[in-house]
Design a protein with these regions (language model features):
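Conserved radical SAM core fold
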Residues: 144-147, 174-179, 190-210, 235-240, ...
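Flexible, acidic/Gly-rich N-terminal and inter-domain linker regions that tether
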Residues: 3-6, 13-16, 20-84
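Catalytic cores of alpha/beta
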Residues: 241-256
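Auxiliary Fe-S-binding modules of radical SAM enzymes
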Residues: 254-358
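Glycine-rich S-adenosyl-L-methionine
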Residues: 209-222
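Cysteine-centered iron-sulfur cluster-binding motifs in ferredoxin-type domains/subunits
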Residues: 88-98
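Structural preference for beta-strand elements that scaffold enzyme active sites
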Residues: 135-139, 167-169, 189-193, 228-232, ...
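Conserved Radical SAM active-site core
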Residues: 58-86, 99-193
Length: 358
């Protein structure tokens, strides 16, 4: 065997070992979440300040202000084109521990999952279903990964099937091992959404999450089972070959399924996120791209964000995906205007009234 062949064989063996270690790490994280070790009181989870809450903005007036578990997200900076949506705080924390995760900015960097006892969640939903008269999306993936513990989320998901007005939104980065309950029993009041990213981004900063391809596979299975299935490509990082990677991601995605909606977003560097990520000693290379300071933390430069959105809009359009089903998340009013997009002031474009139907 030649030296070149030996080196090639060595590289292949090293890559296989790395892939095996990564897979084992994900499996251990998944198994760990099945073991409920800690609960959180409703009064405590109510007081957790969403890391993206903007304290200087005047609170929008609501007919019902929520309870301890179902709460409105309604404090956004005046220059951001975001509005009210409803959080379902059934749990806090996430075992996937992505380097850039904004949850690092809450609970002093604590990421270990804590769960509200199911009976409290169901009682809170009973009240919410009565007090909120209009069809509403309840986002179960704001302070946690919605599929991090299927055993805990199943009775909550099934609660939504007792009525036909409101829907639960399951936002996740888990793969096929956490979706069996969705495949076993079709449900009409459930929206599934996978957050996916370019392969290089996933390898660098989403190491414990399922690979992008595994997430696409899971989304495809759920979509084929009849669920309203959406995709969130966020945060989009301008890595050296970002155009090639995200173009490939779109091609891979659309070759497997046609999502009901697609959400795009770029990194947001809240100061607490950055501070507690440093304290956790994670790889901070994700923060190198920030160039602009906004009322919602650091962002990529305006022109770079605009270029990213235009590029992805063009690729989606070329692939035949309807742009009316694409939105951008937590962006400035100026960006919406620059892209020629329409938004409804005071309403969330991703989880609000306009996004309720597939």
């Amino acid at each position: 065997m030649s030296k070149i062949e030996k080196r090639k064989k060595h590289r292949e063996a090293a890559y296989k070992a790395w892939a095996t270690m990564k897979k084992e790490k994900r499996e251990k994280a998944t198994i760990k979440t099945q073991k409920i070790t800690e609960f959180i009181e409703p009064s405590v989870i109510q007081k957790i300040k969403h890391p993206e809450t903007y304290r200087f903005q005047q609170v929008q007036k609501l007919a019902w202000k929520g309870n301890r578990i179902v709460l409105p997200f309604h404090k956004t900076p005046p220059d951001i084109a975001c509005g009210v949506f409803w959080e379902l705080r059934w749990a806090y924390g996430c075992p996937l521990d992505c380097n850039y995760c904004y949850l690092r900015g809450t609970m002093r960097g604590r990421m270990k999952p804590q769960y509200v006892k199911t009976e409290h969640v169901l009682e809170a939903l009973d009240e919410a279903f009565t007090k909120i008269p209009w069809p509403t999306i309840f986002n179960a993936g704001e302070l946690s990964d919605a599929l991090m513990n299927p055993k805990m989320i199943i009775p909550i998901v099934d609660k939504f099937e007792e009525q036909n007005k409101h829907k639960i939104y399951l936002l996740t980065k888990f793969g096929i091992k956490n979706i069996q309950f969705l495949l076993d029993k079709p449900r009409k009041q459930v929206i599934c959404c996978w957050s996916i990213n370019a392969p290089t981004v996933a390898k660098l900063w989403e190491k414990a999450a399922a690979s992008p391809y595994e997430r696409i596979k899971a989304a495809t299975l759920v979509k084929n089972a009849g669920y309203d299935t959406r995709i969130r490509i966020d945060p989009i990082f301008p890595i050296s070959n970002w155009k090639e990677e995200y173009h490939h991601l779109i091609n891979e995605l659309l070759s497997h399924l046609t999502p009901n909606r697609i959400i795009l977003g770029t990194p947001r560097g809240l100061w607490k996120t950055i501070e507690y990520a440093k304290r956790a000693n994670v790889d901070m290379s994700w923060a190198q791209f920030f160039r602009e300071h906004t009322s919602w933390g650091k962002k990529l430069s305006f022109e770079q964000r605009k270029e990213i959105y235009q590029f992805l809009f063009n690729k989606l359009d070329s692939a035949g995906y309807p742009l009316s089903k694409v939105t951008i998340c937590k962006e400035t009013v100026d960006m919406w205007n620059a892209l020629g997009l329409h938004y409804t002031p005071g309403m969330c474009n991703c989880y609000g009234k306009n996004a309720f139907d597939p």
